[in-house]
Amino acid sequence: MKKSLAIGMIGLAASAAAQACPDYLNTEMRKLSSKETINFCDSYAGKPMLIVNTASNCGYTPQFTGLEQLHQNYKDQGLVVVGFSSDDFFQEENDEADAATVCFEKYDVSFPVMATSSVRGRNANPVFKGLGEAQGYPKWNFNKYVVSAEGEVVAHFGSRVGPSSPELLTLIDEVTGGE
């Protein structure tokens, strides 16, 4: 009896974990200039996220510095910052290795950045399809989406809202349980 109860509890816990991760995050994508992939549900279920569409040759590209600072400041509170390289606005390097150089060497980014993909419209990758349907597709590079630990898309900020903007920081504090 105890064994079947324990098995039932494990099954219930697995079912609850699966329900906690929404379909749009239940996808596996390749990291920038790498063969390594990330399944967002497996890696980040139950964690708040800041998801950003990025480009290497944009006037907003220096926001990588602030995004890295957010990553460093909030990672211990569970926040996951993820960049999505995209050429939808024609400002990403054609070669992924060059895009990776900008991210990881020039801006010293340590948070995950995904391989170049589309982030808007019918060609959007599954993550941005979900974000776009919930809060609108990005109209330019460096749009920021705040996602709760339950996978709810809480807010969408345009490019002009920088990583240190009070309105963004307030929401990040809310989803991480900070001040």
Predicted stretch roles:
Residues 1-4:
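Positively charged n-region of N-terminal signal peptides that target proteins for export
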Residues 13-17:
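N-terminal signal peptide c-region/cleavage motif recognized by signal peptidases
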Residues 19-26:
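Cleaved targeting-peptide boundary
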Residues 27-48, 69-74:
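A short beta-strand-turn-helix
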Residues 45-49, 76-80, 107-112, 141-142, ...:
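Loop/turn elements at helix/coil->beta-strand transitions in domains of secreted/extracellular proteins
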Residues 53-57:
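Amphipathic alpha-helical repeat scaffolds
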Residues 60-124:
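Structural microenvironment flanking redox-active thiols in thiol-disulfide oxidoreductases
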Residues 126-129, 133-179:
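Thiol-/selenol-based redox modules, centered on thioredoxin-like
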